[in-house]
Design a protein with these regions (language model features):
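Hydrophobic/anchoring residues in structured secondary elements
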Residues: 68-73, 162
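Unchanged
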Residues: 42-67, 75-133
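Generic short beta-strand segments
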Residues: 23-25, 71-77
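N-terminal strand-loop-strand
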Residues: 1-37, 65
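Nudix hydrolase/Nudix homology domain
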Residues: 28, 34-35, 102-165
Length: 165
């Protein structure tokens, strides 16, 4: 099945300058390597991207006491997941919180089957890790965001060639 959608994601940072990532795998494709991703999902009809980002963050992580920031990045990605082909135009917000534990709320069945866990990552640890991450260019663009140097306009971080994730 082909799904063309607009989506919202969140780079969630805590007071210790760590980023929160969800560990996921494709429940349909056992040969696809697990990855770490920023929380997010589809934008509902008439829904603002910041509202969608906050809703998705809560559903996927259980973290709800946040300060939502602006859209820092955009990306156009195409990928297969759970037997679906996604063509996704994404707005990626930054948000801050005091911390929190992974306690997902209201996951869709496919998400519940895909999510392995989640945790906070320190910048150095993320930059040194060879674990696959999404967005694919997260490591290249995260350092100034964690330092508080937000772009005046969203930066397009789309992969050069659209690739499966």
């Amino acid at each position: 099945m082909f799904l063309k959608r607009n989506a919202a994601r969140v780079v969630l940072l805590d007071k210790k300058e760590r980023i929160f990532l969800v560990n996921a795998e494709d429940p349909i494709d056992p040969f696809k390597e697990p990855w770490w991703e920023i929380p997010g999902g589809g934008i509902g009809r008439g829904e603002d991207s910041s509202v969608a980002a906050e809703r998705e963050l809560y559903e996927e992580t259980g973290i709800d006491s946040i300060k939502m920031g602006p859209v820092i990045w955009t990306q156009h990605v195409q990928f297969t997941f759970g037997g679906y082909f996604f063509d996704s135009y994404e707005k990626i917000h930054v948000a801050w919180c005091d911390g929190g534990e992974y306690r997902p709320q209201h996951l869709e069945a496919l998400e519940a089957a895909a999510f392995i866990g989640a945790r906070w990552w320190e910048l150095g640890e993320l930059l040194q890790s060879e674990e696959p991450v999404l967005p694919t260019l997260l490591r290249e663009h995260i350092t100034p965001i964690i330092a508080g140097d937000l772009p005046e306009e969203p930066i397009d971080i789309s992969p050069v060639q659209l690739e499966e994730s």
